[in-house]
Amino acid sequence: MKFAEHLSAHITPEWRKQYIQYEAFKDMLYSAQDQAPSVEVTDEDTVKRYFAKFEEKFFQTCEKELAKINTFYSEKLAEAQRRFATLQNELQSSLDAQRESIGVTTLRQRRKPVFHLSHEERVQHRNIKDLKLAFSEFYLSLILLQNYQNLNFTGFRKILKKHDKILETSRGADWRVGHVEVAPFYTCKKINQLISETEAVVTNELEDGDRQKAMKRLRVPPLGAAQPAPAWTTFRVGLFCGIFIVLNITLVLAAVFKLETDRTVWPLIRIYRGGFLLIEFLFLLGINTYGWRQAGVNHVLIFELNPRNNLSHQHLFEIAGFLGILWCLSLLACFFAPISVVPIYVYPLALYGFMVFFLINPTKTFYYKSRFWLLKLLFRVFTAPFHKVGFADFWLADQLNSLSVILMDLEYMICFYSFELKWDENKSLLPNDLQEPEFCHRYTYGVRAIVQCIPAWLRFIQCLRRYRDTKRAFPHLVNAGKYSTTFFTVTFAALYSTHKERQHSDTMVFLYLWVVFCAISSCYTLIWDLKMDWGLFDKNAGENTFLREEIVYPQKAYYYCAIIEDVILRFAWTIQISITATAFQPHVGDIIATVFAPLEVFRRFVWNFFRLENEHLNNCGEFRAVRDISVAPLNADDQTLLEQMMDQEDGVRNRQKNRSWKYNQSISLRRPRLASQSKARDTKVLIEDTDDEANT
């Protein structure tokens, strides 16, 4: 592998601009070689003056790059030293507190089941667990800095060697010896000392002297490009996808020859449509993950996942393919229920029951850590007013907004099985003979409208919570206003539907209101998508017309196509309303929903690429490459006090003499920011534990 490719594959994406600009140096050298005057047509002195002038410019550029690298390395090293001191202090405080409360001196003697601990002991136990996670993440940051040191030195050595080869001189080697090999970023060995001290602290204080266990916790994943998936995972992905395609063809043929009446078809479609959308979402999320990795968008950091243990795109494809096979088999079983001894209504229950069990399975199998992380995240989303909202929280809530049809189909399935299903009919999903046919598919009692509003409500209260935490009306209250338009849209759609069924005279009034609020909502969300979520239409875009100053994906056409796609699908409701308002055939609304629901999932798939790109560029602007792990978050008063104590000679070590903390927990491990340094973005999100159990 050429060094340029090696460098590109191994850099820390958030620090990209702080590395040696190796490609730019190569271009300088090759350009100088191509533009050099020929000895055959000019005298030798002219050629020498040309190369002397070029070398002067070249080495000036090298000096600027070297100064940039020295400065960045020194800043990051100083930050690491401060953080290590804070971590050591917090560890000592936690250990001292445990010794005082429990009366023992070693971690091993203190270990007992968590449910036997008092409240104070639980807090201390949690602090130790958080400290293990914080040291693990800190160790990763040290390895990244060490990698930065090695890559830049190798880059200088390679480019100066190339300089000497092209110009047939030894001045490049002399410059390396006189400048690079004595540069602080190369001669400073404190990073190696910090790595050794961190390993020693974790081994002796947190893992009872078990170095093997400590190094397993501190293990850093390969820093290069994405590692190839295990062969069996790749095999299963191919196998599942192949079977899924064959089963889909079989489904189409079976649907043509087996389905007879609308009374049988539409309950099946409504019940199985949500499962298909979920499978589509998982598959497209796998493509998202692959695209992020290829483009260098650090989604692991953005979602604050465990960098040592998380799902790759191969795993997501595998899950989607496996669930897709089960979905096809379940639907085929319904088609052939007349020749089966199992009642037809069992198959949907078995399918969705398995999906739920797969998610909540308490055993440490089938991607236990990832499933548990998702469950915790779902809990945070549905209890949004009671937690600080991070990026992963509102990202998942945004996904739910595009998957609202799944919630509506789930509500329909529960209602259908509870009130409409004819249980004595084992061969088809026939509704019973109610006075109101298809009772569960109507807005009559408002339940469907409420269910349809749930995802927008979750984002609405998340925005209010973020406003409460930050006191910034923009963007949080403005964003809440965007989601509130969904409430009006759904309300007037429901009123129009019910009034149309009952042939009320004011039906058209609700149709016009529905159209007006759909237009307002679409314009609002479209502008927010392009300007706020994607960061496009930046006035400083320069040559990236209508985009932003810096873009990650290689082709500008991707951005322009995404803009057009977002405009079209944001206003796809115009087709839906036009057909719904003019058609008199039954089930037109079902047909429209079945067609447009997968398109909305696709729109969200495209949205994900550019939303995470924007967040990634924010991280690059802050040079944030690892997670911010806190033992206990600081309130405003605590943070002010901490900053004052850091200015004192004693630092933070004697802080307990100055004040009794509101919470009997350790202070934040994160280096406190001044108000002028803070960003509007708050990305502290739920993280996975780094326990020793395997993910699979």
From Swiss-Prot:
Q: Residue positions of the PTM Phosphothreonine?
A: T690
Q: GO biological process: any one?
A: intracellular phosphate ion homeostasis
Intramembrane residue segments, as ranges: 366-383
Q: Enumerate the spans annotated as EXS domain.
A: 439-643
Region named Disordered: 672-696
Annotated coiled-coil positions are none
Q: Topology: which residues are Extracellular?
A: 260-264, 338-343, 423-429, 504-506, 586-587
Subunit and interaction comment: Homodimer.
* Family per record: Belongs to the SYG1 (TC 2.A.94) family.
**What is the annotated role of this protein in its UniProt record?**
Inorganic ion transporter that mediates phosphate ion export across plasma membrane. Plays a major role in phosphate homeostasis, preventing intracellular phosphate accumulation and possible calcium phosphate precipitation, ultimately preserving calcium signaling. Binds inositol hexakisphosphate (Ins6P) and similar inositol polyphosphates, such as 5-diphospho-inositol pentakisphosphate (5-InsP7), which are important intracellular signaling molecules involved in regulation of phosphate flux.
- Name of the protein in question: Solute carrier family 53 member 1
Give the species this sequence originates from: Cricetulus griseus (Chinese hamster)
Question: Organism classification, top ranks?
Answer: Eukaryota, Metazoa, Chordata, Craniata, Vertebrata
